[in-house]
Amino acid sequence: MTHQTHAYHMVNPSPWPLTGALSALLMTSGLAMWFHFNSTALLMIGLTTNMLTMYQWWRDIIRESTFQGHHTPAVQKGLRYGMILFIISEVLFFTGFFWAFYHSSLAPTPELGGCWPPTGIHPLNPLEVPLLNTSVLLASGVSITWAHHSLMEGDRNHMLQALFITITLGVYFTLLQASEYYEAPFTISDGVYGSTFFVATGFHGLHVIIGSTFLIVCFFRQLKFHFTSNHHFGFEAAAWYWHFVDVVWLFLYVSIYWWG
């Protein structure tokens, strides 16, 4: 047995970054195959390998943090910096989509009819499903904060209730968004309006699904007493991510649905 004289976690070699990258390649290639050739086989393989990677990577992190005690205060500080930088990178990711939208809408070209929305496009009513979606996500922001406060105060039952409500609202948002896509009077192939609308709201929807998955993992961990009032970075990271998703939706709603 070796003894370390520092507070940092020397991670064992792991296959999950490689399998995660390969599954992402399969998913993006599968998406292109689905769009162009109506074949979902590659996409399904990518999704399956991605789910397997996520399950096993999360399992390893839970073992290292909760059961082996490798997540010392110094390690948690590094993880916090990592999560903050990740969220900043996500902000820049969505900035690109907003840039594309405003670039197209503030000075519409003659090909678009010199107006926005382009000629022939019938935009969705912002006071119907989009407003309900906004209410749902804002309510989920309140419930995740309730869960965090309950955890800090050691109130396990209220934490589980609030977390369950947040997950339910996240799933409800996803179903509403799917129904909106199904009923939309335009498609992703309807010029720059369709492209910017579906890519921006679609990537946001993907982030809601990722955030919901993150919260579901936290819910099951809390059922097994993994979190304490002073050792719960996994939940804290999920809450930060959820608030980020919430704020991005507000910008999407104001920009694309209401103004655009």
Swiss-Prot record:
Component of the cytochrome c oxidase, the last enzyme in the mitochondrial electron transport chain which drives oxidative phosphorylation. The respiratory chain contains 3 multisubunit complexes succinate dehydrogenase (complex II, CII), ubiquinol-cytochrome c oxidoreductase (cytochrome b-c1 complex, complex III, CIII) and cytochrome c oxidase (complex IV, CIV), that cooperate to transfer electrons derived from NADH and succinate to molecular oxygen, creating an electrochemical gradient over the inner membrane that drives transmembrane transport and the ATP synthase. It is an enzyme of class 7 (translocase). PROSITE patterns: COX3. It is a multi-pass membrane protein. One of its GO terms (cellular component) is mitochondrial inner membrane. It catalyses: 4 Fe(II)-[cytochrome c] + O2 + 8 H(+)(in) = 4 Fe(III)-[cytochrome c] + 2 H2O + 4 H(+)(out). It comes from Bos mutus grunniens. It comes from the Eukaryota. CDD domains: Cyt_c_Oxidase_III. Its main location: mitochondrion. The chain crosses the membrane at residues 16-34, 41-66, 73-105, 129-152, 156-183, 191-223, 233-256. Component of the cytochrome c oxidase (complex IV, CIV), a multisubunit enzyme composed of 14 subunits. The complex is composed of a catalytic core of 3 subunits MT-CO1, MT-CO2 and MT-CO3, encoded in the mitochondrial DNA, and 11 supernumerary subunits COX4I, COX5A, COX5B, COX6A, COX6B, COX6C, COX7A, COX7B, COX7C, COX8 and NDUFA4, which are encoded in the nuclear genome. One of its GO terms (biological process) is mitochondrial electron transport, cytochrome c to oxygen. The lineage of its organism: Eukaryota, Metazoa, Chordata, Craniata, Vertebrata. It is found in: Mitochondrion inner membrane. One of its GO terms (molecular function) is cytochrome-c oxidase activity. Residues 1-15, 67-72, 153-155, 224-232 are mitochondrial matrix. SUPFAM superfamilies: Cytochrome c oxidase subunit III-like. Its EC number is 7.1.1.9. Coiled coil: none annotated. Belongs to the cytochrome c oxidase subunit 3 family. Keywords: Membrane, Mitochondrion, Mitochondrion inner membrane, Translocase, Transmembrane, Transmembrane helix. This is Cytochrome c oxidase subunit 3.
